[in-house]
Amino acid sequence: PRDIVTKLRHFATANGGTDAMKNEYLPSEDWVTPEELYACTTCSACVEQCPLFIDQMGKIIEMRRFLTMEGQLTGTAVRTLQKLGSHGNPWGFESGDRTPWAKENEVPVLGNGAGNNAEEFDVIFWTGCFGAYDPRGQEVASTISELLKEAGVKFAIMGPSETCTGDPARRLGEEALFQELAMTLSLIHI
């Protein structure tokens, strides 16, 4: 990310200062390549550690949006976005596969014997895609579930009705898909 910001500074200097950045969404590949933009994991560590308080991630995501609008996404990014759109998660797993870990740990699932009314519970535990599908994420979700049980908190998970928050789509630069997934969440009052 530091190199991208440095290249953006050089681009602005070579093209009349910061006003050049206002009119250009993305400098040509001579300045910043798509490979450089997608090499960033968008973990935000650079933003947290930057002594100059530069928002590198915001600039990178904005340039990714431009690439997406121009139809320049390829490979893994395209497949991930397709899976998000069709299956509601970045891996393309079926929604019914979100809960096997919960059954093993006796975690109540809304609409599956736990009742259909979210108001019956103190907490609706949002596991997210990682917590639902990834083995390491399932371990974390199981541990949190155990802590909630020990604390006497009445909780449930959404199970198959839970979908992705859309964060991977936003980070890849696909704002429209992010908005669509976010709208789905707002319809279920989250």
Language-model-detected regions and their locations in the chain:
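Iron-sulfur-cluster electron-transfer modules
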Residues: R2-I188
